[in-house]
Amino acid sequence: MELVLKNEDVVSLLNSIKEANLAYQEDKQSHIKDFAKAQSPMCTLVMCCDSRAHSTSFTYNPENNFFIVRNIGNQYILNQGCVEYGVRVLNTPLLIFLGHTACGAVKASMGNYGNLHSSIIREIDHLALSIQKSDISTSCSAEERWRDAVINNVNQQVELAIKDFADLRLS
């Protein structure tokens, strides 16, 4: 399917984004001044880039509280440098991997995704390896296997991060 936008549609979309940003700045102006010069998040949050999954799902104020890293399937390896920056440079005391129900990337990794663009295939390949390592029951429904795969993916990402951050300990 080819997406065709008229110039006026693009201009309208950009103006809408600009207006929303200006309204946000006005609404949060005093709050933003508190951290304009430096960030000090309490958590590095790795989450899926699915447009339905948002950091505001569990906090009304993610600004300067979360160093957010997003990719398909909330994978550690795809953005390892970003995660390292949050944990080691910004010194966030928490690292959270946030999975979500009905993750399309996880579902794709469980099936045939060879018809997708090569850059997407490379990213899903990491998920597929993670899912294949998991012990997911084949005796349950496809929906239950998908749910279990989402959970197992989060667990796999946590295990990878634990290995890389083994030198860090709670004090």
Language-model-derived ranges and their functions:
Residues 43-44, 67-70, 96:
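Short glycine-rich or small-residue beta-strand-to-loop segments that form or flank ligand, phosphate
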Residues 26-65:
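N-terminal short beta-loop-beta anion/metal-coordinating cradle
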Residues 94-101, 105:
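Ordered, amphipathic secondary-structure segments that act as subunit-interaction surfaces
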Residues 1-7, 55-59, 67:
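Terminal alpha-helical anchor/extension segments at protein ends
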